[in-house]
Amino acid sequence: MTTDSVAAPAHRVLGAGKGCLLIAGGGTGGHVFPALAVAREWLGREPQGARSVVIVGTERGMEAKLVPQAGLPLETIRVAGLKGMGGTKLLKNLAMLPAGFWDSEKIMRRHTFSAAFGVGGYAAGPMILAARLHRVPSVIFEPNVEPGFTNRVLAGISTRVACGFQETATRFGSKAIATGIPVRAEFFAAPRGEHREPFRILITGGSRGALPINRAVIDSLNLLAPRKNQLFIVHQTGERDYNAVRVAYARREFRAEVVPFIENMAERFAQADLIVCRSGAITVAEVAAAGRAAIFIPFGAATDAHQTRNAEAMQNAGAARLLPQTELTPERLTREIFSLLDQPRRITEMEDCARKLARPDAVEDIVNMIEGLVRQ
């Protein structure tokens, strides 16, 4: 936590080479990882100590662990989600709003912020509103094709909007720019695939795994078995399903590496000929950066169907195939895999299309937007 200090009015805008950046939001990795990338870029543009950053989130989101691990200051506010809630849960979360706004106001009084950057999630709403009331210019970041609830609300009061996709920027109008999504440099370093046997498939449902994907793959193994000598599968299962999935591969004598969690995902992307995965904004951006062919299986319950819209954008660009979870059967999954296994040229075409969507300068462009507001 940052110590209290009131050195200047909270709305005073400093020069672009100085000042403290407020980064607000969090909850999931899709919120936190862009926040960390922007924080590092903001701090790294000036000598050490010339700039500072304060990240504001909640005690329950991934930011509570990831931000301190990154060595960055985290402050928290009392706030919870409203969209999709009902009954007593909605009433409880509504009752928390005054506390969240009060916490936000106290943070604004403690610091002299040059600008604010909202990454979506519960904490972004109260903090970006507080920034507006204190006349601190703000940029909000929307990585998905379909904007989230918080960002749809905040777009009207923010100064600028940075978007992961051009069609989203068009939707927000003149204040928006398509910057792309910040992705670690390791993903861009992936070499072009050679697609020689064994055909390497990476399967992942995210760090916690995805039961529907794990179950569909297990049920597909008998159908894949006639060509198992052509395949090598790396499968990230999550902790819950690890043993069941590992045993399923072993019983059928597949060449496979089954792990509960993958530490260096960029390295695994680089080794894969095909990736079977969810289609959250960060994952989609990583697939594009690595230039890999993918079969996207969107999380069906994702808010506003944003994963489906992300996957549709990639499929429409020729960079991926979309397999809706409602259509995820062993037969369909096997058919999609064999179709690409038999068409290495098609995989190469998908890879080329994916690379065209990658935005290696995304984090630089976002910080340029922020600095532009500070200079005004």
Identify what each model region corresponds to.
Residues 3-4, 359-376:
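C-terminal alpha-helical cap of glycosyltransferases
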Residues 16, 49, 61, 66-70, ...:
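Donor-nucleotide binding loops and adjacent catalytic segments primarily
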Residues 321-324, 328-345:
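C-terminal "capping" alpha-helix adjacent to the active site of nucleotide-linked donor transferases
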Residues 103-117, 123-139, 152-156:
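Glycosyltransferases and closely related glycan-assembly transferases
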Residues 346-360:
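A short, well-ordered alpha-helix in the C-terminal region of glycosyltransferases
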Residues 18-26, 44, 49-99, 239-241, ...:
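Conserved nucleotide-sugar phosphate-binding/catalytic loop shared by glycosyltransferases and other
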Residues 62, 132-192:
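Active-site-proximal region of nucleotide-activated glycan assembly enzymes
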Residues 113-115, 270-285, 292-293:
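Acidic donor-binding loop of glycosyltransferase active sites
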